[in-house]
Every structure is written in structure tokens, then in C-alpha cells.
């Protein structure tokens, strides 16, 4: 927490959660415990007059050996109760992340409510899903009760406290322009300048200008992948009227070790803001296809929801149309729906509606409009479905797959042709085509022995193995002169 940030949040009407920092690092040592508690209490005294501040949280992602120390956990709960007396008007939570079950009492859900001195171990559910994947996957929505954002938890405050750390590049051209115009390099300016030069070289070598126009257009297009993914998660939570808090992971990208973020380190929006803000509208129709690919001609099942923060209620007419890749639009369905309104901010309007998709291959747009009894347009929405026309005659010639052993492309090929799709090898005879579904960068790269040089000049790799996630309990040390180990799901 920072007073200058909270002052601005007060002006803008933003709500903030605040943490003291480093609280989890304090063990049983009385001196360190005094330091972190003093820091916590001073933070509360300093910031409690800010109306934008609504939650105090002690620890981000409580875990590791200290989380298994029941005596230490009990001490921390007492710290929390004492701090709550300084400002009983706010919610105070023990940790963010790692709640597991709705009806169980858990330390991970410990909370103190406003003007309530009782420590509750249920009623506050926060679980983090920060890891990717890199793109939205169609498996993330298969129906009203089969989707990534679904929950039947209706008894607790429900948070998704860290969602989707999706990697996208910074607006490197804009950063380079700002450094050039201001002459201010700072501590990292040369890093960004060198990265921009590398982008320029890649852009020209690959002749990307006819397709993307500029480096900035390219990086914004890549940023849109992340924005659309985050938006679809937010939409899923809102349209199902589930949950109370959604936190994008994260706001600002760190320069080296984590490239997720809405903005880069120079505060440039990484993608086009409209890609993200479509999903944050206060009122629209959420169009949710259960599959985003269809074999032409075919039918695609679609569910229609309303995101309703404008308190629409009563009878309305929902009309659905499909727009073909060449812009021709045809109405498919018109149906009367009833909207609840009030504190129902998301509602399923029409379920499992099968829409015929036929015509040329390309992107088909499913559109929905909601009108009142007077015919006035109140809300609308859209999504896209990729229509694909193919037959096995198109899969002629000799080919191979550069992918993983369980790649769905291989399964599809075998089902379509009755033949096995061989894995690519460098010693194969000339091929007509190759399907590539993985990066060449994940191929084994030999590390030269001289890279393992120790202080005394000996070329050897020293490997320390630990028993725990926090790298505190040493299991053993071994030496080798080459790296040839394979670890399931990474090291």
C-alpha cells in the first residue's frame, strides 16, 4: 500500500486491498515478529482514513513449511485479531489463495468481518489460478455447468484472486520512441533499445510488414490474445452471476522474469483496450458457443446470457442472427425471454440453441440483440465460430507431424483418413507437407562442458536436490559433466 496511490484511488472511486508485505517471512523469532507486527499496525493507522481501502490482507499465498507450523499459524491469527481492533471497520483476511472446499473450515479462509471480533474460518473463498495457458481454449466453455468459471459455491464470498498470467510482449516500439524523444534511459533503457533493434531485425527478416503494418501493430495484436482471454474469464464469472472478485494477474509486466500484465513497464496498454472493455460493459448479451469450430455444413450449439448491471427486468425479445464471412446476415431465432434484474447481475436467457452454419470456410459471427416490448434495442453481443470445409481428398501426399506424441492433430488425421500420421524426423524422405504444433525451441540444446566451470577451474555441474518447494531441506548434492535428465512436467 502507498498513500499516494490510495489518494488517487479515493478520487477515482477505485477499491483497494492492502498488504503489509513480508509478514510470511517472520517465523518464531520475537525480534522479527515485532518488526512485521509494527509494520502492519503502522500501515493500518496510516491508511485507515482512505475510503478506497476496503480489505487488509496479511499474507499473499500462505504456504511452505511455515504454513504447516500450527503453533506459528495460531500466533499469526492472534496478530490478525489485534490488528483488527485498530480498524474494525474493514474486512481483514489471513491470506489470499488456496481455499479448497466450500463447507470446510480452513486457515486459508480465515477472516474478520467489519465490527465483528470473531475469527471465522469459512465464508471467504479465494483460490488462485495464475498459470496460463497462453490462449483461450474452447474446452473452457462447454455449457452452463461445464466451464472454466463455473462454481456452485453460493454460501461464501467468492474470489478469483489471481487469474491467468498470460505472457505478451511490451509495446516495444512505443517504449523506444519515448526513450528517443525524452533522452531518459533510466536503469533499463538500453535493454529496451536493444530489444527494439532485435524486433526490427526479426520484423524485416520475416517480411511481416505486409501482414502487420508495423512492429507496434504486431505487439498489440499479440497483446489482444491476452486481453481476449482475460475478458472471456471475466465474462464467464459475470454472466453466471457467480463470484464477487476477479483479479487479473497482473497489472504491470515485470521487465525480465514475467511478461504478463495489462500494461508494460512504461504503462502502455499491451493490446487494444476495446478488446478487453467489450467484456466489462455494464450491459450486454454474452454469446457463448459450446464449440468454436464447426465442420461445414453443420450446427453449433450456443448459450445466450445477459450481463445486467443496469437493472433490466421483465419481458424482452431476444433475436439471434448469423453473419457469414462475406458479410451476409440471416436471422435464425426470435424468442421472448424474462429478465430477473435486481441483484441478479447475470442470467442464462437461452440454452443450447443449435444454429445452422453453412457456406464458405471462414469466421462466422453469431449476433444477439435484446429489445423491449416497444422494440427499443437495449443490449447486444456477439462471438465468432470458425467454419471449416474439408474432406480427406484434401489430405493428399506424404506428410508428417512435428508435435507431441498425444497431439490431437494425429488423432484427427487417423480418424479422417484411416492412416497414421508419422512423427517428423530429420532423416525422412521428401515430404509434401508438415503440420507444426510445437516450437522448435523445445528441442534439446546441448550445453558445452566449459559452461560448468567451477571456481577452481574444474568443469563440472553441481546439482543440489531439495525435498520441499521452498528449497530449505537439502536432499543431496551430485555432480555431472552433462545435462541429460528429463523431468516430467518440468524440473
Specify the residue positions occupied by each region the protein language model found:
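Aromatic-Pro/Gly-enriched surface loop or interdomain linker
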Residues: 361-369, 373-437, 464, 477-491
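A short acidic, amphipathic alpha-helical/loop segment
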Residues: 4-8, 412, 444-452
Amino acid at each position: 500500500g502507498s498513500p499516494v496511490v490510495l489518494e488517487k484511488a479515493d478520487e477515482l472511486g477505485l477499491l483497494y486491498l492492502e498488504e503489509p508485505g513480508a509478514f510470511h517471512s517472520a517465523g518464531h523469532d520475537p525480534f522479527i515478529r515485532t518488526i512485521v507486527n509494527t509494520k502492519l499496525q503502522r500501515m493500518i493507522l496510516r491508511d485507515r482514513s482512505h475510503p478506497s481501502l476496503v480489505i487488509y490482507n496479511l499474507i499473499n499465498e500462505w504456504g511452505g513449511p511455515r504454513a504447516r507450523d500450527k503453533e506459528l499459524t495460531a500466533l499469526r491469527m492472534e496478530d490478525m485479531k489485534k490488528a483488527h481492533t485498530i480498524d474494525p471497520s474493514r474486512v481483514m483476511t489471513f491470506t489470499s489463495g488456496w481455499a479448497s472446499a466450500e463447507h470446510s473450515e480452513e486457515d486459508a479462509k480465515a477472516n474478520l468481518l467489519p465490527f465483528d471480533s470473531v475469527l471465522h474460518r469459512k465464508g471467504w473463498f479465494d483460490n488462485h489460478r495464475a498459470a496460463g495457458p497462453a490462449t483461450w481454449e474452447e474446452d473452457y466453455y462447454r455449457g452452463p455447468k461445464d466451464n472454466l468459471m463455473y462454481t456452485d459455491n453460493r454460501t461464501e464470498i467468492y474470489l478469483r484472486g489471481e487469474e491467468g498470467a498470460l505472457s505478451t510482449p511490451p509495446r516495444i516500439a512505443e517504449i523506444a520512441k519515448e526513450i528517443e524523444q525524452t533522452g531518459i534511459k533510466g536503469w533499463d533503457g538500453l535493454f529496451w533499445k536493444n530489444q527494439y533493434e532485435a524486433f526490427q531485425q526479426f520484423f524485416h527478416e520475416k517480411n511481416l510488414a505486409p501482414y502487420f503494418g508495423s512492429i507496434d501493430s504486431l505487439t498489440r495484436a499479440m497483446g489482444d490474445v491476452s486481453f481476449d482471454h482475460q475478458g472471456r474469464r471475466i465474462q464467464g464469472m459475470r454472466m453466471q452471476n457467480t463470484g464477487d472478485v476477479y483479479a487479473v494477474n497482473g497489472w504491470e509486466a515485470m521487465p525480465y522474469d514475467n511478461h504478463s500484465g495489462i500494461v508494460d513497464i512504461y504503462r502502455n496498454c499491451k493490446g487494444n483496450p476495446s478488446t478487453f472493455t467489450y467484456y466489462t460493459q455494464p450491459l450486454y448479451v454474452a454469446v457463448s458457443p459450446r464449440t468454436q469450430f464447426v465442420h461445414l455444413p453443420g450446427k453449433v450449439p450456443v448459450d445466450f446470457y445477459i450481463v445486467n448491471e443496469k437493472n433490466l427486468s421483465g419481458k424482452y425479445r431476444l433475436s439471434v442472427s448469423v453473419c457469414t464471412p462475406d458479410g451476409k446476415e440471416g436471422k435464425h431465432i426470435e424468442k421472448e425471454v424474462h429478465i430477473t434484474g435486481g441483484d441478479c447481475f447475470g442470467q442464462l436467457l437461452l440454452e443450447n440453441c443449435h444454429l445452422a452454419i453453412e457456406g464458405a470456410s471462414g469466421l462466422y459471427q453469431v449476433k444477439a440483440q435484446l429489445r423491449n416490448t416497444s422494440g427499443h434495442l437495449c443490449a447486444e453481443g456477439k462471438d465468432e465460430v470458425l467454419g471449416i470445409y474439408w474432406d480427406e481428398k484434401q489430405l493428399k501426399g506424404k506428410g508428417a507431424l512435428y508435435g507431441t506424441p498425444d497431439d490431437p492433430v494425429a488423432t484427427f488425421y487417423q480418424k479422417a483418413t484411416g492412416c497414421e500420421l508419422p512423427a517428423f524426423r530429420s532423416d525422412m524422405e521428401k515430404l509434401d507437407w508438415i503440420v507444426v504444433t510445437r516450437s522448435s525451441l523445445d528441442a534439446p540444446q546441448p550445453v558445452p562442458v566449459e559452461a560448468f566451470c567451477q571456481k577452481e577451474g574444474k568443469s563440472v555441474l553441481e546439482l543440489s536436490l531439495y525435498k520441499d518447494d521452498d528449497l530449505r531441506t537439502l536432499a543431496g548434492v551430485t555432480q555431472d559433466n552433462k545435462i541429460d535428465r528429463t523431468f516430467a512436467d518440468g524440473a
